[in-house]
């Protein structure tokens, strides 16, 4: 069961995230503005990093996919330190438990961020557009709604960029990677070369989950995970051979 979970959480889920986050735009907050950009489809523009953006319905669907996939990744990171036990020493155990705490914080705050700035925002934009098309919003009311949404997007506590929620989730992701790597290194269950892509995942994920950092991060996670699995498998085979 754990083998199946490993491949689902650390290979399949990151691969899905790579696929969807290639179409997750960035750098639109200041110009043209959050609502002004997300409210309609956009062709590829290097300024916004994504291969393309398909409109507010895609923003909703993207985050509906992304949220559970990140949950699976969190389970996968937890599985990485699952074998660490009392025989591995106090430092390794301490790092493993701190890693679990960081993974928990990452999962909670990333889910909050996606719920507010992804799923909720996407549906809100669609509802606002529907009300405007039906004539139930005056232009003045519409302008007020747009102002409110743009203001919430940069809110220091729950906004989609640079907020407490966003930064907490991002740094918790980085801390998770660092602490998982530390636990595995201290326990002798992984080497430095194997942990470099895991640390790269944490740093890139801390920087952003939009394109291109998001796809790069999850690509590095796949490399680190497959490498770690292969190393453990080879070690187990070596131990099973007669002396």
Task: Go through the PLM ranges and name each one.
Residues 1-243:
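Hydrophobic, aromatic-enriched alpha-helical segments typical of multi-pass transmembrane helices
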């Amino acid at each position: 069961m754990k083998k199946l979970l490993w491949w689902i959480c650390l290979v399949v889920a990151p691969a899905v995230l790579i696929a969807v986050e290639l179409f997750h735009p960035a750098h639109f907050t200041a110009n043209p503005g959050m609502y002004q950009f997300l409210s309609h489809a956009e062709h590829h523009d290097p300024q916004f990093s994504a291969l393309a953006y398909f409109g507010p319905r895609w923003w909703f669907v993207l985050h509906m996919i992304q949220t559970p996939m990140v949950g699976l990744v969190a389970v996968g990171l937890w599985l990485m330190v699952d074998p660490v036990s009392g025989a591995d020493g106090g430092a390794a155990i301490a790092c493993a438990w701190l890693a679990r705490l960081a993974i928990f914080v990452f999962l909670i705050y990333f889910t909050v961020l996606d719920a507010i700035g992804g799923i909720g925002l996407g549906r809100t934009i669609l509802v606002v557009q529907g009300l405007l098309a039906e004539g139930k919003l005056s232009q003045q009311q519409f302008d007020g709604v747009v102002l409110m949404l743009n203001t919430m997007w940069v809110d220091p506590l729950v906004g989609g960029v640079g907020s407490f929620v966003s930064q907490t989730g991002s740094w918790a992701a980085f801390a998770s990677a660092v602490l998982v790597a530390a636990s595995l290194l201290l326990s002798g269950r992984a080497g430095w070369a194997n942990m470099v892509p895991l640390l790269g995942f944490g740093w890139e994920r801390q920087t952003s989950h939009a394109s291109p950092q998001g796809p790069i991060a999850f690509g590095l996670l796949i490399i680190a995970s497959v490498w770690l699995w292969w190393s453990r498998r080879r070690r187990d085979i070596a131990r099973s051979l007669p002396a």
